[in-house]
Design a protein with these regions (language model features):
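Short beta-strand segments
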Residues: 24-59, 75-76
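Active-site-adjacent structural patch at catalytic or cofactor/ligand-binding sites
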Residues: 57-59, 69-82, 91-102
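Extreme N-terminal tail/first-helix region
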Residues: 1-22
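Charged, gly/pro-rich active-site loop segments
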Residues: 2-8, 83-157
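Beta-strand secondary-structure signal
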Residues: 28, 54, 74, 98, ...
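Anion-coordinating catalytic cores for phosphoryl-, nucleotidyl-, and glycosidic chemistry
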Residues: 9, 18, 62-64, 75
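Short Pro/Gly-enriched beta-strand edge/turn motifs at strand-loop
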Residues: 11-12, 23-28, 124-127
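A generic structural signal for nonpolar/aromatic side chains embedded in well-ordered alpha-helices
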Residues: 21, 66-67, 117
Protein backbone atom coordinates (compact mmCIF):
# COMPACT_ATOMS: atom_id res chain seq x y z
CA UNK A 1 0.00 0.00 0.00
CA UNK A 2 2.74 2.50 0.95
CA UNK A 3 5.58 2.84 -1.52
CA UNK A 4 9.19 2.64 -0.43
CA UNK A 5 11.67 5.43 -1.05
CA UNK A 6 13.24 4.74 -4.42
CA UNK A 7 16.78 6.00 -3.72
CA UNK A 8 17.92 3.85 -0.82
CA UNK A 9 21.02 5.99 -0.20
CA UNK A 10 18.73 8.89 0.83
CA UNK A 11 16.80 6.98 3.51
CA UNK A 12 17.26 8.12 7.10
CA UNK A 13 16.98 5.84 10.13
CA UNK A 14 13.91 5.45 12.32
CA UNK A 15 15.67 7.42 15.08
CA UNK A 16 16.44 10.24 12.63
CA UNK A 17 12.79 10.22 11.50
CA UNK A 18 11.68 10.59 15.11
CA UNK A 19 14.15 13.45 15.65
CA UNK A 20 12.79 15.33 12.62
CA UNK A 21 9.25 14.91 13.92
CA UNK A 22 10.24 16.02 17.43
CA UNK A 23 12.21 19.09 16.36
CA UNK A 24 10.43 20.44 13.28
CA UNK A 25 8.43 23.55 14.12
CA UNK A 26 5.89 23.25 11.30
CA UNK A 27 4.52 20.63 8.99
CA UNK A 28 2.03 20.35 6.15
CA UNK A 29 -1.18 18.40 6.64
CA UNK A 30 -2.86 17.09 3.48
CA UNK A 31 -6.47 15.95 3.56
CA UNK A 32 -8.56 14.32 0.85
CA UNK A 33 -11.01 16.59 -0.93
CA UNK A 34 -13.22 15.87 -3.92
CA UNK A 35 -11.02 17.10 -6.77
CA UNK A 36 -7.74 18.17 -5.22
CA UNK A 37 -5.93 17.46 -1.96
CA UNK A 38 -6.31 20.20 0.65
CA UNK A 39 -2.96 21.04 2.28
CA UNK A 40 -2.37 23.40 5.15
CA UNK A 41 0.75 24.28 7.19
CA UNK A 42 0.32 23.58 10.90
CA UNK A 43 2.17 23.59 14.21
CA UNK A 44 2.30 20.12 15.74
CA UNK A 45 3.60 17.90 18.51
CA UNK A 46 4.92 14.36 17.94
CA UNK A 47 4.58 11.70 20.65
CA UNK A 48 6.90 8.81 19.77
CA UNK A 49 5.49 6.60 22.55
CA UNK A 50 2.03 6.75 21.00
CA UNK A 51 3.25 6.98 17.39
CA UNK A 52 1.00 10.00 16.97
CA UNK A 53 1.06 13.59 15.78
CA UNK A 54 -1.12 16.14 17.58
CA UNK A 55 -2.27 19.55 16.40
CA UNK A 56 -4.80 22.16 17.46
CA UNK A 57 -7.57 23.66 15.42
CA UNK A 58 -10.69 25.73 15.66
CA UNK A 59 -13.89 23.71 15.81
CA UNK A 60 -15.15 24.88 12.40
CA UNK A 61 -13.68 25.38 8.94
CA UNK A 62 -12.59 23.58 5.80
CA UNK A 63 -10.05 21.36 7.57
CA UNK A 64 -12.64 20.21 10.12
CA UNK A 65 -15.28 19.59 7.43
CA UNK A 66 -12.88 17.50 5.34
CA UNK A 67 -11.62 15.47 8.32
CA UNK A 68 -15.22 14.67 9.23
CA UNK A 69 -15.72 13.22 5.72
CA UNK A 70 -12.43 11.30 5.42
CA UNK A 71 -9.88 10.90 8.19
CA UNK A 72 -7.03 9.57 6.00
CA UNK A 73 -4.23 12.13 5.94
CA UNK A 74 -0.66 12.69 4.86
CA UNK A 75 1.69 14.82 6.94
CA UNK A 76 5.07 16.23 5.89
CA UNK A 77 7.72 17.70 8.21
CA UNK A 78 10.91 19.37 7.01
CA UNK A 79 13.95 18.97 9.24
CA UNK A 80 17.17 20.89 9.46
CA UNK A 81 19.34 21.96 6.56
CA UNK A 82 22.91 20.72 6.71
CA UNK A 83 25.84 22.19 4.76
CA UNK A 84 28.51 19.58 3.98
CA UNK A 85 31.85 19.74 2.25
CA UNK A 86 31.71 23.50 1.61
CA UNK A 87 28.89 22.92 -0.87
CA UNK A 88 26.55 25.81 -1.63
CA UNK A 89 23.54 23.48 -1.71
CA UNK A 90 22.22 22.23 1.63
CA UNK A 91 21.15 18.72 2.50
CA UNK A 92 17.56 18.72 3.76
CA UNK A 93 15.83 16.11 5.92
CA UNK A 94 12.14 15.39 5.47
CA UNK A 95 9.57 12.97 6.82
CA UNK A 96 6.29 11.84 5.28
CA UNK A 97 3.72 10.17 7.53
CA UNK A 98 0.38 8.61 6.62
CA UNK A 99 -2.36 7.91 9.10
CA UNK A 100 -5.85 8.51 10.33
CA UNK A 101 -6.73 11.77 12.01
CA UNK A 102 -9.48 12.10 14.59
CA UNK A 103 -10.78 14.74 16.95
CA UNK A 104 -9.89 14.02 20.58
CA UNK A 105 -13.28 13.99 22.29
CA UNK A 106 -12.22 13.36 25.90
CA UNK A 107 -11.58 16.71 27.62
CA UNK A 108 -8.83 15.41 29.94
CA UNK A 109 -6.97 13.89 26.98
CA UNK A 110 -7.51 17.13 25.01
CA UNK A 111 -5.97 19.23 27.79
CA UNK A 112 -3.02 16.83 28.21
CA UNK A 113 -2.32 16.91 24.47
CA UNK A 114 -2.74 20.69 24.37
CA UNK A 115 -0.22 21.15 27.19
CA UNK A 116 2.39 18.90 25.54
CA UNK A 117 1.79 20.70 22.25
CA UNK A 118 2.15 24.14 23.84
CA UNK A 119 5.32 23.17 25.74
CA UNK A 120 7.03 22.75 22.37
CA UNK A 121 6.37 26.39 21.45
CA UNK A 122 6.13 28.42 24.66
CA UNK A 123 9.19 29.35 26.75
CA UNK A 124 7.73 28.39 30.14
CA UNK A 125 5.21 26.07 31.74
CA UNK A 126 3.63 29.04 33.52
CA UNK A 127 2.85 30.70 30.19
CA UNK A 128 1.41 27.43 28.89
CA UNK A 129 -0.84 26.98 31.92
CA UNK A 130 -2.07 30.57 31.68
CA UNK A 131 -2.77 30.30 27.95
CA UNK A 132 -4.64 27.01 28.41
CA UNK A 133 -6.71 28.50 31.23
CA UNK A 134 -7.73 31.44 29.04
CA UNK A 135 -8.01 29.90 25.58
CA UNK A 136 -8.72 26.18 25.78
CA UNK A 137 -12.51 26.42 25.54
CA UNK A 138 -12.61 27.09 21.80
CA UNK A 139 -9.72 24.79 20.89
CA UNK A 140 -10.03 21.36 19.34
CA UNK A 141 -7.14 18.90 19.45
CA UNK A 142 -6.63 16.31 16.73
CA UNK A 143 -4.54 13.15 16.80
CA UNK A 144 -2.99 11.51 13.74
CA UNK A 145 -2.35 7.84 14.46
CA UNK A 146 0.61 7.08 12.22
CA UNK A 147 0.23 3.97 10.05
CA UNK A 148 3.38 4.46 7.97
CA UNK A 149 6.27 6.90 7.93
CA UNK A 150 9.46 7.34 5.97
CA UNK A 151 12.24 9.87 5.89
CA UNK A 152 15.07 10.93 3.67
CA UNK A 153 17.87 13.42 3.27
CA UNK A 154 18.57 14.96 -0.13
CA UNK A 155 20.88 17.65 -1.41
CA UNK A 156 18.85 20.53 -2.82
CA UNK A 157 20.69 21.40 -6.03
Amino acid sequence: MFKEIRKKKNIITLEEIKEVLKKARRGVLSINDEEYPYSIPINFYYDDNKEAIYFHSSRIGTKVDLLNKDNKVCFVAIGKEIIKDLSWAPYVESVVAFGRCNLIKNMDETLQALKKFAMKYYPSEEMVDEEIKVGSIGVAMYKIEIEHKSGKIVQEK
